[in-house]
Amino acid sequence: MRTLWIVAVLLLGVEGSLVQFETLIMKIAGRSGLLWYSAYGCYCGWGGHGLPQDATDRCCFVHDCCYGKATDCNPKTVSYTYSEENGEIVCGGDNPCGTQICECDKAAAICFRDNIPSYSNKYWLFLPKNCRGDPEPC
C-alpha cells in the first residue's frame, strides 16, 4: 500500500506521457496502469533488470526498449496526440517524438490487454533482488 501511495504522489506532478500512458492502458486494456502495472515483475515501474518474469513483465521490458529507442526526447514527460477511429487508437500530431512515444505506449497497452491471463499476483510488488539473469538485448 505504501508503494501505491508513493507512486500516486509522484504522478500528481507529472504531465505528459506517463499520464497519457495510464489513459491508454485504461482505454485499451480496461485496467488502471497505476494499480496493475506500476510495481509488477522486474520491468513494470521505474527501472528494470534481470529476466522478465512472465508475458506481462515482458510487455514492460519491450516498452522500456521502445522508450530507449526514442530519439531526441524524454519519453516520460513529452505530451502526444492521439485519436480514436473505429475503436482503434491512432497516434499522430506534429511532434515526431510524441508520435514515437504514443506508439510505444499503445503497443504496451495492447500487450497488457493480450496478456491479461499471464498476470500473476506473485509478481505484484516483486522485490528487485529476485530479478536475476541477463535479459536479451532490446
From Swiss-Prot:
The UniProt record lists the keyword Lyase: no
Disulfide bonds, paired cysteine numbers: 42-131, 44-60, 59-111, 65-138, 66-104, 73-97, 91-102
Enzyme class: hydrolase
EC identifiers of the protein: 3.1.1.4
Localization per Swiss-Prot or TrEMBL: Secreted
InterPro entries the UniProt entry points to: PLipase_A2 (IPR001211), PLipase_A2_Asp_AS (IPR033112), PLipase_A2_dom (IPR016090), PLipase_A2_dom_sf (IPR036444), PLipase_A2_His_AS (IPR033113)
Family matches, as CDD domains: PLA2c
Cofactors required: Ca(2+)
Summary of the tissues where the protein is detected: Expressed by the venom gland.
One Gene Ontology term, aspect cellular component: extracellular region
Family matches, as SMART domains: PA2c (SM00085)
Domain of life, source organism: Eukaryota
Active-site residues, record numbering mapped to chain: 63, 105
Pfam families (UniProt xref): Phospholip_A2_1
Position of the signal peptide: 1-16
Principal cellular location given in the protein's record: secreted
Catalytic activity, reaction form: a 1,2-diacyl-sn-glycero-3-phosphocholine + H2O = a 1-acyl-sn-glycero-3-phosphocholine + a fatty acid + H(+)
GO molecular function: calcium ion binding; calcium-dependent phospholipase A2 activity; phospholipid binding; toxin activity
Keywords, comma-separated and alphabetical: Calcium, Disulfide bond, Hemostasis impairing toxin, Hydrolase, Lipid degradation, Lipid metabolism, Metal-binding, Platelet aggregation inhibiting toxin, Secreted, Signal, Toxin
Other notes: Negative results: has no edema-inducing activities.
Family as reported in the entry's similarity comment: Belongs to the phospholipase A2 family. Group II subfamily. D49 sub-subfamily.
Function: Snake venom phospholipase A2 (PLA2) that significantly inhibits ADP-induced platelet aggregation in platelet-rich plasma of human, rabbit and guinea pig. PLA2 catalyzes the calcium-dependent hydrolysis of the 2-acyl groups in 3-sn-phosphoglycerides.
PANTHER family listed in its UniProt record: PHOSPHOLIPASE A2 FAMILY MEMBER, PHOSPHOLIPASE A2, MEMBRANE ASSOCIATED
The protein, known as: Acidic phospholipase A2 Cvv-E6a
Organism placement in taxonomy: Eukaryota, Metazoa, Chordata, Craniata, Vertebrata
